[in-house]
Each structure stands twice: as structure tokens, then as C-alpha cells.
Amino acid sequence: MVLVYLNSNLNLRSLKETNHDFLINSTERLTTNQILSTSVILTTMNDLTNWARLSSLWPLLYGTSCCFIEFASLIGSRFDFDRYGLVPRSSPRQADLIITAGTVTMKMAPSLVRLYEQMAEPKYVIAMGACTITGGMFSTDSYSTVRGVDKLIPVNVYLPGCPPKPEAIIDGVIKLRKQIAQENTNQKHFSFEHKHRYFSTNHKLNYPTTCYNENSVNLLSQQLSNNDLFSFMKIPVDNCFTEE
């Protein structure tokens, strides 16, 4: 097999007129014979690099919730995701794909960003599940849930579902492979901007310094004597939660 580097200024139309077959990101097995036109493959370094990347994706499994159980079934023999060249890695320095499956909390956000920064370039992200994409059922009144992992790291493929099926995960990997096949290695493949890609509402809870109101004082006064109550209550009475 001979690989010929084509200059960008070369006229490809003249080559097509000579009945040359262009095999770009082909998955079929190559065969050689006595005919020269089927023994020589004409391609570019860009397509060759993209073919090598999409054929050897090494994912870093970042499972935090029930969505990861669906992804774990892909490792078995029923779905066999090794046929796509995926090799699970436990170190971010050996991975070029991170799959976030499950809820991401505020305390876990710095660790996730650090794992993403330690991955080798070029790197890709698949957001798996409703909790990862929008916060899921925790997106309305949760104070500790990140409402979308794309606010922390750039996302290439979104897999909605609660949880998504293994077939949907395979389809997401195929779509990511198509994105990699169309990339230009001379350009930066990410222009990350913080955007709201979904409708989300922030919680309206305000946390004062005390958690005692008039009802709690009345309940305590019925159970304790006056001396014990005055010695116990050293904080001014205020509402526990007030709505803005």
C-alpha cells in the first residue's frame, strides 16, 4: 500500500478523470491485485490522521450515577464496543475521550475540569443522560447540581435519556467518529463558549443566619421552662427560609 500526499493546490478534478478511486475513511478490507489503480491509495495527511483518530478512541469512564450501568453493559459480549476501537482507560493522560454519565455536583466540578485538562489533545466529550445535559430532575430546586456539564467543559455529542439505551450510546460513538472524520488538523477544533442550550430555572431559596421562627419558638416554649428557653435561645428570631 502506497500513501501519496496530495498538495492542497493540486487539482483533484484531473485525478478523478483518470478513474482513480479515492478511499477516504473506508471500513472495507483492502485487497491488492495486478492492477495498479486498485493497489495505490491516494489520500491526504488530514484524512489519514482523522482515520487513525476515529479508529482508536480511548475513553475515560466518568460514571457518577445510574447512567453508567447502561454504559457498563457495552463492555460485555452482547454489544462488544471493542469493534469500534474503544479501549477503556483509567488514566486521563492515556485517554482522548471522556464520557460523563450521571449527575455532576458543584464539589465534583473542579475535579472534572482537572481531568479534562489532563487529557491529551485532541480530546472529545460525550454527555450521557439527562442529569449530565440539563441537570435532570435536580435542575429546578437543587443547590448542589451543575445544570449542564457543557458549562464546565465543551461537549461534542449529547445523549439524552434517563438513562439512554446501549444502542443510543453506540449511535453517539458513530456520530462522534463522523465528526472526527471531517475535522481539519491544521485548525483548533474547539471554540468553547458558555451558552445556555436549554431552559433552566435557578432556585429561589435564601439562607439566613438563623433557622428559628415564631412557630419553632412556641414549640420550644411548650417543652422547656422559661429559664431553659432564655438560656437556649441566644439568636434573634427570624424566618428560616424566605422567598425572593
Curated annotation (Swiss-Prot):
[4Fe-4S] cluster binds at residues 66-67, 131, 162. One of its GO terms (cellular component) is chloroplast thylakoid membrane. It catalyses: a plastoquinone + NADH + (n+1) H(+)(in) = a plastoquinol + NAD(+) + n H(+)(out); a plastoquinone + NADPH + (n+1) H(+)(in) = a plastoquinol + NADP(+) + n H(+)(out). It is an enzyme of class 7 (translocase). The keyword Transferase does not apply. NCBIfam families: nuoB_fam, PRK06411.1. This is NAD(P)H-quinone oxidoreductase subunit K, chloroplastic.
